[in-house]
Amino acid sequence: MYMWETEIQSFGDYLKIERGLSKHSHEAYLRDIQKLETYLAVSPVAIDQVNESHILAFLKDLHSLGIEASTQSRTLSGIRAFFQFLVFDGTLKSDPTVHVKNPQMGRKLPDTLSFDEITAILEQADLSSPEGVRNRAMLEFLYGAGLRVSELTGLKRDDIYEEQGFIKVRGKGDKERLVPAGRDAFKYLNLYLESVRPSVPVKKDATHLVFLNRRGSGLSRVMVFLICKDLAAKAGINKVISPHTFRHSFATHLIEGGADLRAVQEMLGHESILTTEIYTHLDRAYLTQMVQDFHPFSKLDKRL
């Protein structure tokens, strides 16, 4: 049951009866509203308590997930229509979206976590609980292999090649690639597979999947997002956190450590090197140090 079930039902009836929208458009509107509601469900917010800051924070999280600005704008449009309807029918006195601007086109880089912040988040997973073991294993692969959230939730048991130190993932366009994963990732994966997963009542359509929820079904992207957000909050991290943040941090730390850009491109599954260059944010201090260490003029200055 949704927190805003009554209001969503009324809006749905309005879309079908008053506006005569197609089933596809009707469902798209409701999905947009339910995304916002799911986001706010971490700390439940009543419909009449939603304000502009909630909407802005939600849009920022969509951005951190790598959602394109055009898709963010469409989602905001659905949410805006919902609140306008609630004002019109007297449920609300004001519309929290009235001053919210549509997301600007263009691509901004998501927040990057430091290694210490990554470690602090990983340590919040409670290894005394089944979900904690699973969550630790998932985050180890998000950061240790730079997986997209869809690649993590779609990871199959047959995709694990521990002896070779690789996993097989299916990226965009269902393209397969082999990605190296570290010892800690396999360590916590084995702990999950040996001590947790055997006790889960696995659904028939999920037997091939690695990571499951407590009911034995595959995990949703939203669930992984909420897990990341919850553990980051427990670690005292105030940045906008999502599964995408771990992937971005994976790439950033590799480049800062001296990894070849082409190798990072292959691990991330980017078709174009330009995507990797945009995706990989190098801080100014690192770039300055690179110039000081390797530029001929800098070396000349040291000899004078």
Model-derived features with residue positions:
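Conserved catalytic core of the tyrosine transesterase superfamily
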Residues: 1-304
